[in-house]
Amino acid sequence: MLFVGTALQLFLGAVNASLLAYPLGIVLAANYLYLLILISFNKEKWKWTAHFTGRATYITSLTAMLVLTIIFGLVRQDGAEGAMGALGFSQMKNSWTFNIFLLHFASVIGVKSIDDLRNIKNQKLHTAVMHTAFFIILLAGIFGSGDKQRVTLTTIQGEPTNIGVAEDGKKTELPFIIRLKDFSLEEYPPHIHIYADDNLSKEHIIIKEKGDSATLGKWHIECKEYLEMAGCKPGDSLYRPMNHVGATTAIHVRATAGSDTVEGWISCGSHIFPGSALQLPDGQMLAMPRREVKKYLSQVEVSTGDEIKNFDIAVNSPATIGAWKIYQSGYDNARGRWSTTSTFECVKDSWQPATHAAMWLILAAGVFALFANRTKKKRK
């Protein structure tokens, strides 16, 4: 299989998963499953089926997949050329070698699952269920790969759109329209660093409110005024409260070290107001870098033609529209909390319900096995 996979990789190039797109993927999956059933029923008659049965085959196939998976993890998957690229190791999921071994491994598990189900009276129920569920995951992963779509869509607040960019860079029309209603962003409290020799110190202090104080290096720093939303007129160093687009965080601090005392404003700035630092007598400065983002959320309206739904989309909290999931993947970093654009990754995986069902079966089989073992111990 290694020789065949390498030869196909060198002569044909990477595997084109789009060839398995609906309906061909389902047709091939059905025929593949039928072939495995034939193998299970005729393994004693067909000698060549020994390549899919037996303990030695299980161990060999599993070991091969483990080795390839380790290579998958160690080699950067950037599609680079050269020797590694020619052999498919820099793009393993589209490598002939990897996919041939994966198909063989799935076939071994598939035949074993069918055997377990045929001899359910002689097999542990949870073992049969676990093998079958694992096979379903592999089947969906292989034959459903052509149906997976990833489309990146950038929306501007108030402007509905359904045109995104696919992985191949082509513009793609989505079966739904997204309109960004509002964007919100939550940040961690400001960090104050010492800036010297064009570098920020690793050591820092956190200021949350007026009256906070801490020591940074040799300087004792006290917050005299804290403005979450502030602005500064051009040419002025005084920050005033401002609830308007572009408002930034500004802190008035007093820094003391021995007989040296300085006061002034520190700000991280925004896309409108430049940041400001406090000059210290020793040539260093107190500076506030851009605040770290804690979480961000987009309130959107999604229209499918038949209905309109509202969603709050955040990282790890996607919206679901039919077979599509809409993930929050970015925003206008320059504008930060004042971003008027959101970037979404729209992912379609028609085989995902089968995968989810299989994972629940694995969980159920594990729980059943746990209680079954406890019952046996009690009987003994």
Can you say where each PLM-predicted feature lies in the sequence?
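Solvent-exposed, non-transmembrane regions of integral membrane proteins
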Residues: M1-K380
